[in-house]
């Protein structure tokens, strides 16, 4: 289920080659849901919506296809080495030697890894503010039928509601995902 990022959109005038290459590779498809009454345009959404196929994780997996991605290890230390970096787990075992390291993790976790190596941007990481977001998943055989596939109410506690079945390549059973508004 797409319980995080619901779709990608591209600003008007964006080069189409990236979108087209993802669609040609079968990792993305256009999605144009029927929006519910009173729905505003979702924040930062353009007119060209794209979803991952068969799930949203297909796009980052495609982007990382030529990278050495390793899972199920908790890296707790970065150590400068002769030719790059050593990545150590919580037992001190070197899990990877790398020329470069890209961190795509929450700021507090990044700060814990970067502070021992003298990273100069710790103040910037400390200034990051998070806002929790509640997500509700509803799946069942007898769910009511709605006249819309997605809605982004402009007021109230809900910021986004979508029928997962409206997305190409998804299970046809109605499965609803509701995300709270930022203010809720």
Question: Where does each model-flagged region fall?
Answer:
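A conserved short coil-to-beta-strand element within the FAD-binding core of flavoproteins
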Residues: 71-86
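Glycine-rich phosphate-binding loop signature in dinucleotide/nucleotide-binding domains
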Residues: 81, 91-97
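N-terminal FAD cofactor-binding segment of flavoenzymes
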Residues: 1-35
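Short beta-strand to alpha-helix junction loop
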Residues: 10-11, 32-62
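A structural motif corresponding to the C-terminal end of an alpha-helix
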Residues: 63-70
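Active-site substrate-recognition segment that forms the wall
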Residues: 131, 137-184
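Generic structural signal for small/hydrophobic residues in well-ordered secondary structure
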Residues: 8, 63, 102-104, 138, ...
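Central helical "cap/lid" subdomain
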Residues: 95-151
């Amino acid at each position: 289920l797409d319980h995080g990022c619901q779709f990608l959109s591209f600003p008007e005038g964006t080069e189409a080659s990236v979108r087209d290459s993802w669609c040609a590779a079968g990792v993305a498809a256009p999605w144009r849901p029927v929006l519910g009454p009173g729905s505003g345009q979702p924040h930062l959404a353009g007119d060209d919506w794209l979803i991952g196929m068969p799930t949203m994780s297909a796009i980052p997996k495609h982007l990382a296809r030529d990278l050495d991605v390793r899972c199920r290890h908790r890296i707790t230390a970065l150590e400068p080495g002769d030719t790059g970096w050593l990545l150590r787990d919580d037992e001190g075992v070197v899990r990877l030697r790398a020329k470069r390291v890209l961190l795509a993790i929450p700021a507090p976790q990044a700060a814990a890894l970067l502070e021992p190596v003298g990273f100069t941007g710790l103040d910037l990481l400390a200034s990051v503010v998070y806002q929790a977001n509640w997500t509700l998943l509803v799946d069942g055989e007898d769910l009511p039928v709605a006249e819309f596939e997605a809605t982004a109410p402009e007021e109230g506690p809900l910021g986004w509601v979508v029928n997962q079945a409206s997305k190409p390549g998804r299970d046809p059973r109605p499965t609803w995902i509701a995300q709270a508004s930022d203010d809720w």
